[in-house]
């Protein structure tokens, strides 16, 4: 099995290390040709506006969209979830107008849990995965779903309230958090099970 990890900005190295620990071939995706013959794609956390601009500048948007529409699973973590969402607003600034792939029927609020200093670790329960330890760093909240998208897990937070932190639509997973920081393999195993189907 070959899993591509978008390697333009952000914490892609941590995802690659975990995939290799799981015995999966991980490939860096930096240009459209790197998407050939992969069984799944991870879009990592980082700065969503920067990653989106780099996706656009490197002409990766349409090839990624075609890949996902063809049935190849994708997992977006934190900034990756923002890029997968069809609707994006910022908790403070409102409408962002930022580039996004817009593949999932979800609406997200950027920085929903506060700024960098409001980062936190949590144990959450996700449908299909179970309990997992994860990190929230300037994370988005999933506040709306429609169509075939469904929320897999929620968190109760003093700033954001009760909000979704994971959503799935077919082979697409949007995660508000960073599973790679804690290294909880259950989330990766779930994603890899989608790639094996």
Question: Where are these predicted regions, by residue range?
Answer:
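Hydrophobic anchor at the start of a short beta-strand
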Residues: 26-27, 74, 172
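N-terminal beta1-alpha1 cap of cysteine-dependent amidohydrolase-like domains
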Residues: 1-57, 62-70, 185-197
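Cofactor-binding loop segments of dinucleotide-utilizing enzymes, especially the Rossmann-like FAD-
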Residues: 8, 79, 177
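Amide-donor transfer/coupling interface in amidating biosynthetic enzymes
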Residues: 110-197
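Residues at the C-termini of beta-strands that transition into short coil/loop
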Residues: 7-9, 30, 105, 112, ...
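Short secondary-structure boundary/hinge segments and terminal tails
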Residues: 36-38, 85, 128
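Redox-cofactor binding/interface segments in oxidoreductases and associated redox assembly factors
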Residues: 43, 76, 175
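Cysteine-nucleophile active-site neighborhood
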Residues: 48-124
């Amino acid at each position: 099995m070959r899993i591509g990890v978008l390697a333009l900005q952000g914490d892609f190295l941590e995802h690659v290390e975990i995939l290799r620990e799981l015995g999966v071939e991980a490939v860096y995706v930096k240009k459209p040709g790197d998407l050939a013959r992969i069984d799944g794609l991870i879009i990592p956390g980082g700065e969503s506006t920067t990653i989106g601009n780099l996706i656009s500048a490197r002409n990766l948007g349409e090839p990624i969209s075609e890949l996902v529409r063809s049935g190849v699973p994708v997992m977006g973590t934190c900034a990756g979830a923002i890029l997968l969402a069809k609707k994006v607003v910022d908790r403070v600034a409102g409408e962002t107008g930022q580039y996004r792939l817009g593949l999932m029927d979800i609406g997200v609020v950027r920085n929903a849990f506060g700024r960098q200093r409001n980062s936190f670790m949590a144990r959450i329960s996700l449908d299909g995965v179970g309990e997992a330890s994860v990190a929230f760093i300037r994370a988005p909240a999933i506040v709306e779903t429609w169509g075939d998208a469904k929320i897999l897990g929620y968190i109760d937070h003093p700033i954001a309230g009760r909000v979704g932190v994971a959503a799935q639509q077919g082979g697409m997973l949007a995660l508000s958090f960073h599973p790679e920081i804690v290294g909880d393999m259950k989330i990766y195993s779930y994603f890899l099970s989608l790639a094996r189907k």
